[in-house]
Amino acid sequence: MKVISNFQNKKILILGLAKSGEAAAKLLTKLGALVTVNDSKPFDQNPAAQALLEEGIKVICGSHPVELLDENFEYMVKNPGIPYDNPMVKRALAKEIPLLTEVELAYFVSEAPIIGITGSNGKTTTTTMIADVLNAGGQSALLSGNIGYPASKVVQKAIAGDTLVMELSSFQLVGVNAFRPHIAVITNLMPTHLDYHGSFEDYVAAKWMIQAQMTESDYLILNANQEISATLAKTTKATVIPFSTQKVVDGAYLNDGILYFKEQAIIAATDLGVPGSHNIENALATIAVAKLSGIADDIIAQCLSHFGGVKHRLQRVGQIKDITFYNDSKSTNILATQKALSGFDNSRLILIAGGLDRGNEFDDLVPDLLGLKQMIILGESAERMKRAANKAEVSYLEARNVAEATELAFKLAQTGDTILLSPANASWDMYPNFEVRGDEFLATFDCLRGDA
């Protein structure tokens, strides 16, 4: 970590804790800043704030009092989840207090080069794939960012010989100014988080900040399957490396079932360790990064063939009596489940789906359901999901929860079948988040395996 004097004796307000705010507070204190932390969670329910107070850091909890900004702070570090229309943020901007992001703070002190990965879908899987391949190739890749390891914490142990492989959300990128990765990946761009950004255009603008400071000596990897990429590519100074599953490009591409990089065959799509058309895209982006990083083709192929996925993201859980289980609880919308289904033989597949009812019909999913062996349907959206199953002429059973659904699926399954949890719905009707939903699937698998 570089020791910089930019923040020495500067009064800095950390607005919002969570993992990133806590890490930023500790880093800034180490750099000599006079830190105050403000978090909306009450102090007696806030272990992170309690720990910071024990370290001598000033904490104010329970609300975001606007008058706190009268203390003449010289910087504010905003938690990514706090929107810019928050009264504290609006007041800080009106007072012309510079806003820093936690990832930019990490950039300022990083001795290690940064590979940044953003996009609407596939960020976590691609970030993990890239780190795995780089490490397999003898490099030292450190996961950081939106993947659960705050960048401002990881950067403190990173040295010049390391590489920070950083997952970045639109929330983290919207406020950056100086941030400059050496390689950036945008997996895809879909209309998401519009409640935060206001419009798809503003959402794209936030994602596009990943390349704002890049030069022609840096590399920007874009999904050439999307028309928007061609438009964006004309506006960057970085060297663009495209990837595509639909056409041959001057980068990474799929052709006749083989993944290539600039005419060099790397691996067959059927040899990838994770199924699904989206994972071919993730693998192509990974191949581009790996080749730019000097990793040998055989190491790339070996690593991608053994990659088992990320927890809750089309995760291959294991087998019981030659019946394979996949946990794709992260698939909270139709598109994600469509991509998951693309990697399987429907005639041998039992799909567990359903969840929070957002009023959407599932007509777009019907073509992907055709030929399914069976569906197990659950959750508030069950009636809508049943209508889709009927249109696809797929038989189904109902379950009260994921555990019961998994048990029913296992009773119906035969040797060689696959059981896939890919709900196409959010979890909040029955579970606090998709992780808890997926964990119930994993726990049920463990019980079934123990009884087998």
Swiss-Prot record:
GO cellular component, one term: cytoplasm
InterPro entries noted in UniProt: Mur-like_cat_sf (IPR036565), Mur_ligase_C (IPR004101), Mur_ligase_C_dom_sf (IPR036615), Mur_ligase_cen (IPR013221), MurD (IPR005762)
Cell compartment(s), UniProt: Cytoplasm
SUPFAM superfamilies for this protein: MurCD N-terminal domain, MurD-like peptide ligases, catalytic domain, MurD-like peptide ligases, peptide-binding domain
Family: Belongs to the MurCDEF family.
Task performed by this protein: Cell wall formation. Catalyzes the addition of glutamate to the nucleotide precursor UDP-N-acetylmuramoyl-L-alanine (UMA).
Protein name per the record: UDP-N-acetylmuramoylalanine--D-glutamate ligase
Source organism of this protein record: Streptococcus pyogenes serotype M5 (strain Manfredo)
